[in-house]
């Protein structure tokens, strides 16, 4: 019967104690190896970050050369100028700035409408002009 049990379980009986939290074989160098591995990972991460910083500085140099060549401004500079331009007229005002109404929208003067009507009437023949004027 023991033979059958050993064959059925295979070599698992030896590891069964370890699975249940029994005695574990401890490698005396395991802690040292783990520390070395952690240190190597930290070094790799530092190297990666330094490489990334170098690449970004090189890219920024190229971007600046292009800006200088074509007379472009940085996005931050452009936004700062726009903000300053928006705030300049507001400084002396006590009310908020009025929104500009595009042409053709909203209330229009009646004089504009009459002048358009007069312009159209000029191109009509005489009898039709009389009909529209009445």
From Swiss-Prot:
UniProt keyword annotations, A-Z: Cell projection, Coiled coil, Cytoplasm, Exocytosis, Neurotransmitter transport, Nucleus, Synapse, Transport
Region of interest called Disordered, as start-end residue ranges on this chain: 1-114
Tissues and organs where the protein is expressed, per its UniProt entry: Nervous system. Present in electric organ (at protein level).
Main location: cytoplasm
Biological process annotations from GO: regulation of neurotransmitter secretion; synaptic vesicle exocytosis
Gene Ontology CC terms: cytosol; nucleus; perikaryon; SNARE complex; terminal bouton
Compositional bias (Basic and acidic residues): 15-85
Coiled coil: 29-84
UniProt keyword Protein biosynthesis present: no
GO molecular function: syntaxin binding
Location within or outside the cell: Cytoplasm, Cytosol; Presynapse; Nucleus; Perikaryon
Subunit structure and binding partners: Binds to the SNARE core complex containing SNAP25, VAMP2 and STX1A.
Similarity comment: family membership: Belongs to the complexin/synaphin family.
Function statement: Positively regulates a late step in synaptic vesicle exocytosis.
Protein name: Complexin-2
């Amino acid at each position: 019967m023991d033979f059958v049990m050993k064959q059925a379980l295979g070599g698992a009986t030896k590891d069964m104690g370890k699975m249940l939290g029994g005695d574990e074989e401890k490698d005396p160098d395991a802690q040292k190896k783990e520390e070395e591995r952690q240190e190597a990972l930290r070094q790799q991460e530092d190297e990666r970050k330094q490489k990334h910083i170098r690449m970004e500085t090189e890219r920024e140099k190229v971007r600046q050369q292009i800006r200088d060549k074509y007379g472009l401004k940085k996005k931050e500079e452009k936004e700062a100028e726009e903000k300053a331009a928006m705030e300049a007229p507001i400084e002396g005002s006590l009310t908020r700035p009025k929104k500009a109404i595009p042409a053709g929208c909203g209330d229009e003067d009646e004089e504009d409408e009459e002048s358009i009507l007069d312009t159209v009437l000029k191109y009509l023949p005489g009898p039709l002009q009389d009909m529209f004027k009445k």
